[in-house]
From Swiss-Prot:
UniProt cross-references to PROSITE patterns, sorted A to Z: RADICAL_SAM
A Gene Ontology biological process term: rRNA base methylation
CDD domains listed in its UniProt record: Radical_SAM
Active-site residues, record numbering mapped to chain: 96, 345
Cofactor(s) it depends on: [4Fe-4S] cluster
Coiled coil residues, start to end: none
Annotated binding of [4Fe-4S] cluster, by residue: 116, 120, 123
Gene Ontology terms, MF aspect: 4 iron, 4 sulfur cluster binding; metal ion binding; rRNA (adenine(2503)-C2-)-methyltransferase activity; rRNA binding; tRNA (adenine(37)-C2)-methyltransferase activity; tRNA binding
Gene3D superfamilies (alphabetical): 1.10.150.530, Aldolase class I
Free-text remark on how the cofactor is bound: Binds 1 [4Fe-4S] cluster. The cluster is coordinated with 3 cysteines and an exchangeable S-adenosyl-L-methionine.
GO cellular component, one term: cytoplasm
Gene: rlmN
Record protein name field: Dual-specificity RNA methyltransferase RlmN
Amino acid sequence: MIASTGKTNLLGLTQQEMEKFFDSIGEKRFRAGQVMKWIHHFGVDDFDAMTNVSKALREKLKACAEVRGPEVVSEDISSDGTRKWVVRVESGSCVETVYIPQGKRGTLCVSSQAGCALDCSFCSTGKQGFNSNLTAAEVIGQVWIANKSFGSVPATVDRAITNVVMMGMGEPLLNFDNVIAAMHLMMDDLGYGISKRRVTLSTSGVVPMIDELSKHIDVSLALSLHAPNDALRNQLVPINKKYPLKMLLESCRRYMSSLGEKRVLTIEYTMLKDINDKVEHAVEMIELLKDTPCKINLIPFNPFPHSGYERPSNNAIRRFQDLLHQAGYNVTVRTTRGEDIDAACGQLVGQVMDRTRRSERYIAVRELSAEADAAPVAVTRT
C-alpha cells in the first residue's frame, strides 16, 4: 500500500476545485490556472520547477500540497506499437492502462477501478473481483503518466494521445464522481484539451447513472451490449438482471438525445463462438437496435486460460458483420492489439506477471485460438 502524506494531491483537482484550494490557502484564484498548466501541460510534479510561481508560494505549496500520480510498476511495448503500463494505486492494487496507436490517432484506454464487481463471464478483469475505486488523481494520473512517457509536453502540442476511452478495468459509472472529475480534466484547456467527441465512457449498463451522466458531462457513450436478448445477457453480463435491455436502451437514447447533436451510441459486442455469433443473434440484434441511432463495434473474443469461451471463426465474424451491414448499420470489427503483452480487450487483469508467466499465457492464448478459421476478415478500422 502506498502511504498517504496527508497533503492535498493537486493532480486530480478540476479547475473549480483548484480555485477553491487556492482560496483556502489565502492565494489568488488565477494561481490555479498557472499550476494546472505546469501539472498537465508540462507534466511537472516539482513545485520548484514552476518558474512563474513565486518562491514564497512554492514553499507554501510544498508544505500543504503535492502532485502525485500512481506508481509505475512496469511498461511494456507490443510488437504492434501498443503500450501497456501497470501502475500501483494508493490502495496497493495494480491497474493497467493501454495506449493504442493507429495512424495519426492515439487512443488511451484508462481504468476506473481496481478489479470489477460486475463479473461479466467473458472478462478476465471480472474474475479477480472488486478491490477499490480509483481516486480522480489516479484516473487522470494514467493520462498524465502516458503523456509524460511520450514526451508530449506541452500536452496540447503534437499530441500522442488524441482520444481517451474509459474502457479499462472497472465500471466507470460505479466510480461516478471521480471519473467525472477526471474526464473534465481531460477536456479542460488547462488540462489536456481533448475534444468531448474524443472522450468516451463505456458502461455495462448502470441505468440510474446513465441518466445522471447528462447532468454533469457530455462525452461520447459506449454500451457493452454483448447479447441481443435478456436471457443470454443475464448469463454474460449479470447486471442485466437488474437493468434489462428495454430499460437500458431507453436510458442510452435519453442520454444521446440530451447531447442535442448528431452523435450516436457505440455498441460493443464481444463475439463468443457458438454463444452469441449465430445468424439468429444478428437478426435479434437488428430488431433490438432498430430505434437506437448507433454504430456497432464487433470484438472477437480474446481468449485467456480457463475462460470457457473461444473466438469465433473468421467466417462467422464476417457473416455476422455482413448481416448487420445489410440491415443498414455501420459495423466495424475491432482489430486485436497488444495481445502479446496481455493488453487486448478483456485481458486486463491488473497483475504484475513475470516474463515466464506472461509467455505461458501468450502460448495458451494462441492454442485456444488455433481452431479459428484462417480466412481473412474484412476489417474496417475504427
